[in-house]
């Protein structure tokens, strides 16, 4: 009677993998959390809201150099889907006209962007008389200008094409803003969004040397 012999397991049998080291597990968890945070951030700035920086004072006194304004991105998507349209008084930002000088980075990102105020839309006529903007012959109140007028600016009657917007900077001084007076009406589908709230800097020094809260809606 033979004696049973114990033979080693066949080499084809798969051995249990060694458990990952604590350091490797920690690294994997860290990378996963960063990836999830990046995806959430991209979704927020694409569909919820982002900010746009103000360079120069062409929109003074409403927006000042160095400030940042909140842009509700859901409004942009609503406009692209035909659920809303940009209207007179909206402060919008868009890609600068094609003749604007661009750096290599701006060519890659689609910039530079400019921010102006809508004063008329497609089918409307814009005039300047006695320093006042008239749309279809009706003077516009423009309370956000604090009494400033286009006294030194002449503008012949302009009929805004359908699907376009006539935009102006709030700084109406000579050479204060390069806007539709220089490059004409802009296509409405180039609008990237509406500036709704000034969110940076949160506080600002006033002319008397004191500090005041700078968070405010864009007029």
Predicted stretch roles:
Residues 1-219:
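Extended hydrophobic leader/signal-anchor segments used for secretion and membrane insertion
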């Amino acid at each position: 009677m033979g004696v049973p012999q114990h033979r080693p397991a066949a080499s084809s049998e798969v051995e249990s993998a060694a458990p990952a080291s604590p350091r490797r597990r920690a690294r994997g968890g860290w990378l996963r959390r960063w990836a999830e945070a990046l995806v959430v951030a991209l979704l927020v700035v694409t569909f919820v809201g982002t900010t746009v920086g103000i360079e120069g004072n062409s929109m003074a006194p409403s927006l000042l150099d160095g400030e940042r304004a909140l842009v509700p991105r859901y409004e942009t998507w609503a406009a692209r889907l035909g659920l809303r349209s940009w209207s007179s008084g909206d402060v919008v930002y868009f890609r600068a006209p094609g003749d604007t000088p661009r750096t290599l980075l701006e060519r890659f990102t689609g910039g530079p962007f400019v921010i102006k105020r809508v004063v008329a839309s497609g089918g409307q006529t814009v005039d300047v008389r006695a320093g006042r903007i008239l749309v279809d012959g009706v003077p516009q109140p423009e309370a956000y200008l604090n009494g400033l007028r286009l006294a030194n600016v002449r503008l012949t009657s302009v009929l805004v094409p359908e699907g376009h917007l006539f935009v102006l900077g709030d700084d109406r001084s000579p050479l204060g803003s390069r806007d539709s007076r220089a490059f004409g009406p802009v296509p409405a589908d180039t609008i990237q969004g509406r500036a709704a709230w000034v969110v940076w800097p949160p506080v600002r020094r006033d002319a008397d040397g004191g500090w005041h809260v700078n968070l405010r809606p864009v007029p």
